[in-house]
Regions:
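Stable alpha-helical structural segments in soluble proteins, enriched in small hydrophobic residues
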Residues: 99-110, 269, 273, 308, ...
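Short glycine-rich phosphate-binding loop at a beta-alpha junction
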Residues: 52-64
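Short helix-capping/linker segments at secondary-structure and domain boundaries
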Residues: 113-118, 224-228, 276-283, 311-324
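Long, charge-rich intrinsically disordered scaffolds of nucleic-acid metabolism proteins
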Residues: 79, 84-204
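Nucleic-acid-processing active sites and adjacent nucleic-acid-binding tracks
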Residues: 24-50, 55
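Gly/Thr-rich phosphate-binding beta-strand-loop-beta motif of the actin/hexokinase/Hsp70
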Residues: 2-22, 106
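Phosphate-backbone recognition surface of nucleic-acid-processing proteins
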Residues: 207, 213, 219-299
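Low-complexity, acidic/Ser/Thr- and charged residue-rich accessory regions of DNA metabolism proteins
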Residues: 288-330
Length: 330
């Protein structure tokens, strides 16, 4: 592990960044742009902070942090992002809130864990663009569903035809969204095919019955092409498939349950994949039929989701496509 002399906490917003060195109680407020980053370098120089021996801790913000991360990579500064909820839950009782105070607490969080910190991998521009495209595709799909509901409700309530102005406009919006969605999906495939390893892994996981293009794209994006999770179980926890104990002392003896702290979008897509796998995979169908005799369907569905995750990670590790060789016993 690289020895870091300074751990800085950075609270990033759309227009500004707040930087704090909790150990020395030093702080800086700057713009989230090139001028602000230059101000940060000068501040470090004024306080004898060696950036080559500095570790920066910041939160995931959904995109506002990318410019600062690009600056860190250009200056060869080690950094790591953490979920905001993880840092928030580590603080204990907190009163009041400000960007400066948040930066101080982020720095404290990093200093307490400095011996266990590992730098993040450099940003992968293809993965970053893939996530952006998937997010925009999701927005288009939701808009389309909204316009479809408008058409359906209007026809039901007012008994109007396709010549109605609102229905015609909504129909035009739906057609435009379909065209844009097709363009987005074409760009996604173009992006995946441009990376040989990414495209091979995509072909591997979509060879599994139940894993279609959307699940394939999202799995590639959120596992960063199977590099950001050490194994299938860690990814299953992230998605919210692994059940955890719910018991304490003698009074609380609940059943194991999955956590609400999960990537809900991935879980939802895997839910659909599990249903399709049960329908079209003889092995999964036989498993579901056997377990339905004494298990709840939701539990079986969750188990199938975990099996699909295990298959994806196992096949990618071996570099092999899925081959259906299940034979049902007579």
């Amino acid at each position: 592990m690289k020895p870091w002399n300074v751990v800085l906490g950075v609270d990033v917003s759309k227009k500004t960044i707040d930087i704090c060195w909790a150990e020395q109680k030093l702080s800086l407020h700057a713009d989230n742009n090139s001028e602000g980053f230059g101000k940060f370098k000068k501040w470090c120089k004024d306080h004898s902070i060696d950036l080559s021996k500095t570790f920066i801790v910041l939160e995931y913000t959904g995109g506002y942090e990318y410019r600062f991360i690009q600056f860190c990579e250009s200056q060869h500064i080690d950094y790591r992002r953490f979920p905001g909820l993880e840092i928030k839950n580590s603080r204990g009782m907190v009163r009041g809130k400000s960007d400066k105070a948040d930066a101080f607490r982020i720095s404290q969080y990093g200093e307490e864990r400095v011996k266990r910190l590992e730098p993040s991998n450099p940003l992968n521009k293809d993965i970053l663009e893939l996530k952006t495209l998937l997010a925009f595709r999701k927005r288009l799909v939701r808009e389309r569903a909204g316009y479809q509901n408008t058409v359906k409700e209007r026809k039901h309530m007012y008994e109007v035809g396709d010549q109605d102005m609102i229905i015609a406009m909504a129909g035009a919006k739906i057609a435009a969204n379909d065209e844009y969605t097709g363009d987005i999906e074409a760009r996604i495939m173009e992006l995946i095919k441009s990376d040989e390893k990414m495209y091979f892994n995509y072909q591997v996981i979509t060879s599994i019955k139940g894993i279609g293009p959307i699940n394939g794209w999202m799995t590639i994006a959120y596992t960063e092409n199977f590099t950001s999770f050490p194994d299938a179980r860690h990814y299953a926890v992230y998605v919210g498939v692994i059940p955890f104990d719910h018991r304490s002392g003698t009074s609380i003896k609940g059943r194991k349950r999955t956590s609400y702290l999960a990537q809900k979008e991935l879980k939802q897509e895997l839910n659909q994949a599990a249903r399709i796998a049960i329908l079209h995979s003889p092995e999964m169908r036989a498993y579901a039929e056997r377990k339905l005799k004494n298990k709840d369907y939701k539990l079986i569905l969750n188990n199938v989701k975990f099996k699909l995750i295990l298959r994806m990670f196992s096949l990618v590790k071996r570099g092999e496509k899925y081959v259906e060789n299940y034979r049902r016993a007579a």
